[in-house]
């Protein structure tokens, strides 16, 4: 499969419509039937999917409309977890942090329903399915059952592997493991790498790895060892500084973060063009994808949309220059190709 050179994509989350947030609150209060809530989620999914497509994104997603939070969604579906109540993250932000109280088991599909819905409703050939990785799920949960962190993480890796195989069997082409916590403890990075490789064992489709707001020099030491096709990383937030670690990227792809999801300022087309050209010093255009730094759910929806619009406009300008050099398309690479 061939894609336009510099394919554009998203990382995962996107601002939920206000009416969907109200439906979440009503559902939590038990004031609406589950079927009404599910209908609202599906409507929001299509709405955001169309928004991404209207912005011109080549490889969209539905902004995780089905998910409350990136770990809670998964721990609620995996057997062996228990919720005690909300935990404060920062300021007035809380999330339901789960505890492993029994051996974890794969009880039901984790994201299959949302993937099939997006696949049915998209106008694009490829969508990217974000899935929180085993290390981050463990790091952001309590362990009240396993004798050590390693056995906890490896059981999660086995469960994620089952989900990935199910998605592949149902036609998924591109999965992204989200591991924002994998560099939190430098001495545990080898454990995180082992868990990722276990999670993707036997998978043949395209797999990306998203890591953000971390020491990428630490990650770069494992570029070759981690069995993924692409590393989706944030650069706009760090103002595109200190990118020498990319020299170790070898034949892996880079998902290049060009808009800051923690700053409401909408980046100009010109500055995004400049950033893309700068990364050409390290990565060949054929190995480069363009995306936001991270999930966009904390932004105002209109701001998020216009950031995507400018991201796509900038990419199209750079494409025109590359086309004059005879570079028009890029191969859609999978794990079979690395």
From Swiss-Prot:
CDD domains: CIMS_C_terminal_like (cd03311). One of its GO terms (biological process) is methionine biosynthetic process. Zn(2+) binds at residues 210, 212, 234, 294. InterPro entries: Met_Synth_C/arc, MetE_arc, UROD/MetE-like_sf. Signal peptide: none annotated. Binds 1 zinc ion per subunit. Pathway: Amino-acid biosynthesis; L-methionine biosynthesis via de novo pathway. Its EC number is 2.1.1.-. Keywords: Amino-acid biosynthesis, Metal-binding, Methionine biosynthesis, Methyltransferase, Transferase, Zinc. One of its GO terms (molecular function) is zinc ion binding. It holds the Pfam family Meth_synt_2. It comes from the Archaea. Its cofactor is Zn(2+). Belongs to the archaeal MetE family. This is Methionine synthase. The gene is metE.
